[in-house]
Amino acid sequence: MDDFKLKNGSGRLCCGGCGRQNNKLNTYDWLADIPGNAEEQVMVEVQFKNTRKGYYKNSNGLHLEKGDIVAVEASPGHDIGTVTLTGRLVPLQMRKANLKPDAEIRRIYRKVKPVDMEKYEEAKSREHDTMIRSRKIAESLGLQMKIGDVEYQGDGNKAIFYYIADERVDFRQLIKVLAETFRVRIEMKQIGARQEAGRIGGIGPCGRELCCATWMTNFVSVSTSAARFQDISL
């Protein structure tokens, strides 16, 4: 099989400079050497751009390893992501993510082909320009919100717009304009300041990489005294 590299840095051929995203939020598989663990591939964890992850059913019985890039079921079409965990730890991670046993689990279609990567590269090349234009559209509509990132689905049929807003925003007109402008299905997803920092990355006052960009997934409240002690903005 050909090796491919995703622009989110999570593919198996990442350079050293992509180390932050390559290892971001990965679970250490301490069962990897246990006999029979490799054969337990019914459920697979897949990571997409930055911190977004999903769990998928390996219904075709593909032999998958960490770092394999796969095409997975989406609505509509398919998405492209990197396998980050297989084996017996996946059900434990699903419970940690509060996925119920009767939840609808989508499928892994295949390991990516060159044609899949062509669509993926074309879609990802539009993300920055789409973000800049969408910010101007939101401003022209008088919406008090900041669009911090845009993520195109692997086949280019859908785009997720991540935004920050202090108050409730009625973005029905915005969705209509965005759909007409970019000719894709639109999903708006509100995130907090720490989630945005996790997506962008950065260095904390301690001199190390931000916790929310490396390992933290549960953003509990930070007390004023703790923020003052860490010398972070209040």
PLM region descriptions:
Residues D2-S233:
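Acidic-enriched and Gly/Ser
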